[in-house]
Amino acid sequence: MSLPEPLLRADWPRERLLRHGAATLSDPELLALALRTGVAGCNAVQLGHDLLRRFGGLRGLLGTSPAELQVVPGLGTAKACVLAAVLELARRTLEEDLVRQDALANPDLVRRYCQAALGHRKVEHCIALYLDARLKLIICAEVARGTLTQAQIYPREIVREALRHHAAALILTHNHPGGTAAASAADIAMTRQIRQALALIDVRLIDHVIVAGAATVSMAAQGHL
């Protein structure tokens, strides 16, 4: 069996990125640039392929903790931390956009942020996006973390944080790991309870976005608020 010929330098991911831009590279090639080197018997691009296959694609890979990544033979602390940093940079880019823009006027940006923050999580998390009077992001804070099927959310904690940050409005988002993005009866009841609690301090609940993998559902758009 003949082995594949080595890539010409002009075909290396770094050289192609410099000539044609990052968008021309495949996912394994982009990962190869982040990883910089491969491991024994496996170059960086092959390692990228292997990681995507092992963890079920980019979302699964980038949602994996550094400790879980280090289980891969040859993938040490440095490479695992680089991959974790890549996801965090992507999330912070979207967060930066929310600081600058009206969240109500940019529902797609909100949806993408929620998906980036929660789509890969393996247990339920609930996050609150606290907004100022111009509906720009003040701070994003985790308000609950639970199990595979539920997270206990306390309206009083959300109200307290809204007062502390002088918020005028907020958006909630939580994930359904391994499920669908459809709002359950419990989701609807809790959301309305939180909306009523916030109304007492004159804070608007604009939306509650449910995330399941790549799917998102706006409870406001579905008439549940």
Curated annotation (Swiss-Prot):
Which GO terms are recorded in the biological process aspect for this UniProt protein? proteolysis
Q: What is this protein called?
A: UPF0758 protein BP1235
**What are this entry's molecular-function GO terms?**
metal ion binding; metallopeptidase activity
Q: Superkingdom of this entry's organism?
A: Bacteria
Keyword list (alphabetical) reads: Hydrolase, Metal-binding, Metalloprotease, Protease, Zinc
Annotated binding of Zn(2+), by residue: H174, H176, D187
Tell me where in this chain the MPN domain is found. Answer: 103-225
Per the UniProt record, the source organism is Bordetella pertussis (strain Tohama I / ATCC BAA-589 / NCTC 13251)
